[in-house]
Regions:
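Pore- and gate-forming transmembrane helices of large, multi-pass membrane proteins
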Residues: 70, 87-125, 144-147
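Hydrophobic transmembrane alpha-helices
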Residues: 18-21, 39, 55-79, 116-119, ...
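Alpha-helical transmembrane segments of polytopic integral membrane proteins
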Residues: 25, 45, 72-79, 109, ...
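Loop-to-transmembrane-helix entry motif
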Residues: 7, 39, 99-110, 135, ...
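Interfacial segments of transmembrane alpha-helices in multi-pass membrane proteins
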Residues: 11-57, 123-127
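Transmembrane alpha-helices and their membrane-interface boundaries in multi-pass membrane transporters
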Residues: 78, 131-163
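Single conserved hydrophobic/aromatic residue that forms the stacking wall/gate
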Residues: 1-12
Length: 163
């Protein structure tokens, strides 16, 4: 069925992205931390679409893929910067403050630009395009919030870097 096929595709993407994180960061804990914010935004937005009874068509189903794709970039940038800065300071709290003032600002600015870019699609007269713009913009906003709040919180909680 279509639902089963879509589920298999998402499982494959999750495994692939997790594998990419493991190869990139060479750290299982850090990889698990890194994928959480990405999937939360995608699952949340698909949940809202389902609750509203909006059918999953080509426009709405690609929202999750786009969300994960962009959120993964944000997570990689944040984790990479955190790792680099932590190697110098060896202090999680100082590193968090530094990362939020540098890469955090960049993630915020690019994410807001992306949200506005997708939001312009609400001016369309084609309903699937309107849905795509609204929900992708909302998903990007949620992904940004997740990467800037949940990701650092998980890093502080789990402390995946060696002192």
């Amino acid at each position: 069925s279509r639902s089963s096929a879509a589920s298999d595709v998402y499982k494959s993407h999750m495994i692939g992205i997790f594998g990419m994180f493991v190869i990139l960061f060479k750290n299982i804990k850090l990889s698990l931390i890194g994928v959480v914010p990405n999937f939360i935004a995608a699952f949340f937005i698909l949940g809202i679409i389902g609750l509203l009874g909006i059918p999953l068509d080509m426009m709405t189903i690609t929202i999750a893929a786009i969300t994960i794709g962009i959120a993964v970039d944000n997570s990689i940038h944040y984790i990479y910067r955190f790792k680099e800065e932590f190697n110098s300071s060896k202090d999680y709290n100082k590193t968090l403050i530094l990362c939020h003032s540098t890469v955090g600002k960049a993630i915020l600015n690019t994410s807001i630009t992306i949200v506005f870019g997708f939001s312009i699609l609400v001016l369309s007269k084609f309903i699937p395009t309107i849905y795509f713009g609204i929900f992708t913009g909302l998903a990007m906003l949620l992904a940004m919030v997740s990467v800037l709040t949940l990701l650092p919180s998980l890093i502080l909680l789990i402390k995946p870097f060696n002192k």
